[in-house]
Amino acid sequence: MMTAGHPGQLADAVKLGHRKFPTGVTVVAAYGSTGPVGLAVNAFSSVSLDPPTVMFCVARTSKTYASLLAVDRVCINILSEDQSDVARTFAVSGGDKFASIRWHRGETGAPVLDGSAAYFEAILEVRLPAYSHEIFLGRVVASSTEPGKRPMVYYDGSMHDVDGHLLDGAR
C-alpha cells in the first residue's frame, strides 16, 4: 500500500488512488460561436432529481474551458462501450473533433453524439471555481437513453466494458 508524507508524494498517491475508482466516460459538448466544441470528462455526477441537476468539472488549462464559459447549454454524452474511438478523439486537444463522428443538435442546440448510451442536455446555472478546475452545475432539460447500449467504464488508466474487459485499442 502506498502512503505519502510530503506534497509531491501525496499528489502521486492521490492520482494512484483515483485510478482505482471506476467512472463512466462522458463527452461534454456545446455549440459555441465557432461551432461545436467538446471534451472527454470523467468528473461527472448527478446532483439532484428535484430539479434534475448534474455536475461536471473541467480543468482551467483545457482548451475547451473558455468555450464552455461562453455558453449556457451543454450536452453530457455518456459514451457506450463501442465508442472507444470517440473517447480517444475527445481526450486530446486540438483538431475538429466532430468531423469524424456522427452527431446532431439536440433540443437545446448542444451536440448529441449518436451511439451514446445516454445523454443529458442541460442549462448551465452555476459555475464554481475549485482550485485548478471549474465545477459546472446544469439543470437537465432533456435526457434520453439508448436501449441495449452499455456504458464505457474508465479505471486504472484504461477504458473497459462493464464486465471489466479492456476495450479494443484502449489505453
List the model feature ranges, each with a label.
Residues 1-171:
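Basic, polyanion-binding surface patches
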